[in-house]
Amino acid sequence: MPDTATVSSESEFSGHAHVAAPPPAGVDVRHDWSLSEVRALYELPLLDLVHKAQTVHRAVFVDNKVQLCSLLSIKTGGCPEDCSYCPQAARYKTGVKAEKLMAVPDVLDAASKARAAGATRFCMGAAWREVKDGPQFDSVLEMVRGVRALGMEACATLGMLSESQAKRLREAGLSAYNHNLDTSPEHYGDIISTRTYEDRLRTLNRVRDAGISVCCGGIIGMGESVDDRCNLLRTLANQEHHPESVPINALVAVEGTPLQEQQRVETVDMVRTIATARILMPQSMVRLSAGRQQMNEEAQLLCMMAGANSLFFGEKLLTTGNPEYTQDMALLEKAGIRPLEPRQEG
């Protein structure tokens, strides 16, 4: 694959609302990475790569703290899309039943419990292709206001958004919006056909233009090549503004999905991906996301050494398992790592 391989619509992901603070001296924040440069980093001897990532991480994030994010499925199943990894797609027989949107009080009760357990960001996910105006969206806005009233950051992942919907979410107090690219532009068509890469970039641009922080990452272990992994990270890093949060997910192969036979992601691959993300996007929160239940404590700590400073926290990530609250808090205590406080926003 030539170094000049690029996304035709990279310029569409150029929102100007979020401007990161100037980086510390000696930290290089770039937006012009070539594929060969990214791959050279990814393929460094592992200890050299982790050392380089940790050096960058320490220059930007001086405290031994991680952001704890709780994720709740507020509308489960019945999604009309065909994402090959997703058990919530209506066309796959995965045992996930379509449910109605949760009631606002139930969501806020879950948020309150997550806060009591130590989470500072509460993310609400709905299995929709796109947001539609009406009573359900009004309920989501009420959920956002309620989460913010609890003193937590509020995040949502609801599918594609219009400009006016993004603006209304911001007015309700939404802190961040998650909309992953999932994989490289080249591999994307093998995973999803019902939404284009450009659709995703366009939604991210609308989120930024509304003044909402972007949470955007991807999934490894979906049959992609090393070049695909590197080009996903390159696509994220070469945007005009790096995402505020970059979730790195390891595929959880669910029976009934087209990717059910995929092999478990090796720890070394996860560490390399996280470390490379940290070097490319020094000021972003790099989130250790799905697949953590398959990792032992040492593997998770190695990911943190490589630059992960955010965790999805709680017993379930939408429909897949995750370590229990008590396990995570015990792990952090053993490692001398403390939870990061929620950001104070205007």
From Swiss-Prot:
InterPro entries, A to Z: Aldolase_TIM (IPR013785), BATS_dom (IPR010722), Biotin_synth/BioAB (IPR002684), Biotin_synthase (IPR024177), Elp3/MiaA/NifB-like_rSAM (IPR006638), rSAM (IPR007197)
Binding annotation for [2Fe-2S] cluster: C123, C155, C215, R287
GO biological process, one term: biotin biosynthetic process
UniProt xrefs under SUPFAM superfamilies: Radical SAM enzymes (SSF102114)
Region (Disordered): 1-21
Note describing how the cofactor binds: Binds 1 [4Fe-4S] cluster. The cluster is coordinated with 3 cysteines and an exchangeable S-adenosyl-L-methionine. Binds 1 [2Fe-2S] cluster. The cluster is coordinated with 3 cysteines and 1 arginine.
Residues reported to bind [4Fe-4S] cluster: C79, C83, C86
Keywords: 2Fe-2S, 4Fe-4S, Biotin biosynthesis, Iron, Iron-sulfur, Metal-binding, S-adenosyl-L-methionine, Transferase
The enzyme's E.C. designation: 2.8.1.6
Pathway(s) per entry: Cofactor biosynthesis; biotin biosynthesis; biotin from 7,8-diaminononanoate: step 2/2
Catalytic activity: (4R,5S)-dethiobiotin + (sulfur carrier)-SH + 2 reduced [2Fe-2S]-[ferredoxin] + 2 S-adenosyl-L-methionine = (sulfur carrier)-H + biotin + 2 5'-deoxyadenosine + 2 L-methionine + 2 oxidized [2Fe-2S]-[ferredoxin]
Keyword GTP-binding in annotation: no
Biased composition (Polar residues): 1-12
Entry superkingdom: Bacteria
Family: Belongs to the radical SAM superfamily. Biotin synthase family.
Role noted for this protein: Catalyzes the conversion of dethiobiotin (DTB) to biotin by the insertion of a sulfur atom into dethiobiotin via a radical-based mechanism.
Name of the protein in question: Biotin synthase
Gene source species: Myxococcus xanthus (strain DK1622)
Gene that encodes the chain: bioB
